[in-house]
Amino acid sequence: MISKIETETQSRMEKCTESFESQIKKIRTGRASPSILDSIQVEYYGASTPLRQLANIVAEDSSHLAVTVFDRNLTPYIEKAIQNSPLGLNPSSAANLIRVPLPPLTEDRRKELIKVIRSEAEAARVAVRNIRASVNKKSKETLKKKEISEDEDRQIQDNVQKLTDRYIKKIDEFLTKKEKEVMTV
């Protein structure tokens, strides 16, 4: 019973951490990263399709992305989707290659991004703590029903606390790494 609870808890905390990391990877840093364009949906023939399914995206250098379109006919649709995105990018195309220059981040924009990153990190920490509280509550309920002993309850709480500490540390490490990326000029 204890290992089942711990495995389930670890799985839930891992999902929270992965979700946080995927959200943060979308935030633009000073360097070109293909994941910046992950959220872009391309409208063509009445359907909305993720850009990644229609093109290959690579970082040419620290300030340019190259989008190689699989089907030449989609180039104007993809270019329009990138222009209309909230990222404020201005692509230029030639045949089936779209170059996306990334303008340097201003100091104010960097500070804004750090605030966003920190709030996302705090939300992830709260989610992990809520999972801990939920598991501790379930553990207390099963103790009241006499399904587990007090020692087992204590062991569950200790192990869940260790998991909580580990995942919060992981979130903090990722936060620190991302803050450094954003502040690097």
From Swiss-Prot:
Responsible for the release of ribosomes from messenger RNA at the termination of protein biosynthesis. May increase the efficiency of translation by recycling ribosomes from one round of translation to another. It is found in: Cytoplasm. Keywords: Cytoplasm, Protein biosynthesis. NCBIfam families: frr. Its main location: cytoplasm. The keyword Ribonucleoprotein does not apply. The keyword RNA-binding does not apply. The gene is frr. GO terms for molecular function: ribosomal large subunit binding. It comes from the Bacteria. PANTHER family: MITOCHONDRIAL RIBOSOME RECYCLING FACTOR PSEUDO 1, RIBOSOME RECYCLING FACTOR. This is Ribosome-recycling factor. One of its GO terms (cellular component) is cytosol. Pfam families: RRF (PF01765). GO terms for biological process: cytoplasmic translational termination. Belongs to the RRF family. CDD domains: RRF.
